[in-house]
Each structure stands twice: as C-alpha cells, then as structure tokens.
Curated annotation (Swiss-Prot):
Residues 1-28 form the signal peptide. One of its GO terms (molecular function) is receptor ligand activity. This is Secreted and transmembrane protein 1. The chain crosses the membrane at residues 146-166.
Amino acid sequence: MQTCPLAFPGHVSQALGTLLFLAASLSAQNEGWDSPICTEGVVSVSWGENTVMSCNISNAFSHVNIKLRAHGQESAIFNEVAPGYFSRDGWQLQVQGGVAQLVIKGARDSHAGLYMWHLVGHQRNNRQVTLEVSGAEPQSAPDTGFWPVPAVVTAVFILLVALVMFAWYRCRCSQQRREKKFFLLEPQMKVAALRAGAQQGLSRASAELWTPDSEPTPRPLALVFKPSPLGALELLSPQPLFPYAADP
C-alpha cells in the first residue's frame, strides 16, 4: 500500500506562522501587564469609623492620582509620585511597590463620594469606588449642671471676696453708728458731769458752813471763891464762866 505525504498549501503555512508569532508576542506582553485589583463598587462605613481602600498591581507604581467627586464638585486628594507616605485632611495614602492603600481616619460626611483612581505602572489604569458614610454626627452631650473646675474656682473666689467686703461694711457701719451715738451723747454727758460736780461742790460748801443752834449750849460750871471777913475763902455756888456764851 502506497502512502502520500501530507502537504499544506503555502498560504496555510503562512497563516500558522503568523498565529504562532502573535501567541509568542502576547505571552511576552502578558508578563508586563499591571493586572490591577482594586476595591470597587460601594463601601459603606458608619460615621466616625475608619476604612481602607486599596489597589494592587503586578508591577511597581510610578504615579498615583486620586480624585473625589461629591455634590457635583470634583477635587484632587492626592497626585503623588510613588513610593511614599502622604496625609491630608483625614486621608492617608501609602504607596509601596505595587500596593497602594488609602486610609480614612474617622469617616465624616466630607469623606463621602465617588473616588476615582488613576494608576500608572507599566500601563495606565482607572478605577472607581463609592464611599457612603451612614449615621449622623453625634450631638454634644447635654449640660448636666456640673461646672468646669475653672468656673468653680472663680465662683468660690468671688464669693469669698463678697463675704469679706460685706463683713468690712458691717464693721464700718457699726463703728460709724457708735461714733455718731457718742457725738450725740457727749453734750448730755458733759451737762450731767457739770451737774454732778455742782451738786458735790454745794454739798462740801454746806458742810463747811456754820449753822447756830436754836438754843445755846450750856457751859460747864465754875467754882467762885469770895473772901470772908474771917479771913477765909467762902465757897459760893458754882456760876457759869460765860453765862451768855454759845457754841460756835
């Protein structure tokens, strides 16, 4: 039995060669693709909590650009050359090799919106992710009636000063009343003293004055001797020496 060798036409051989070349080229190119893997879709976080969004590529980043679109306005958050660590208004971006992480500390309403990533490695890639912040900003604690320490110290100091001033005022008023009362009583005291002195002087003067008795005070009797013819003394009846004299 005779066999016939397979033979391909010329255009078929050229086509196969072209396909092999393209496959080899694609394989070589695939080794340099970034193949980014990023946080996508919608990320929800409660008010005040932290959140992280990231993008990873097969090659090292050379440039990272992140923008935020919210309320119809678009603003650039980071436009940095990698690698490095960057921070701004609660956002923190860290780029090292093929890893880029965006950290939000204490999410607020101003952090919510559409984040647009523009990544540059061996290729340029664009990614988007939406951040939603739920919940409302916590209200400040109601006044419980307690005063802060500086206010308490100030109030106590003012109270002490007021008490001291009040005590001084009362003492001053009492002293003024005593002085006024003394000034009012001083003339009366002087008059009373003059009267007392006058009465005492009159008493002394009346004691020193001599007042005659209504009847004379009898004086002691004296013996009177009269010569007798017989040459002897005759004893007469006693007679007062000064019959009409009176006691002083």
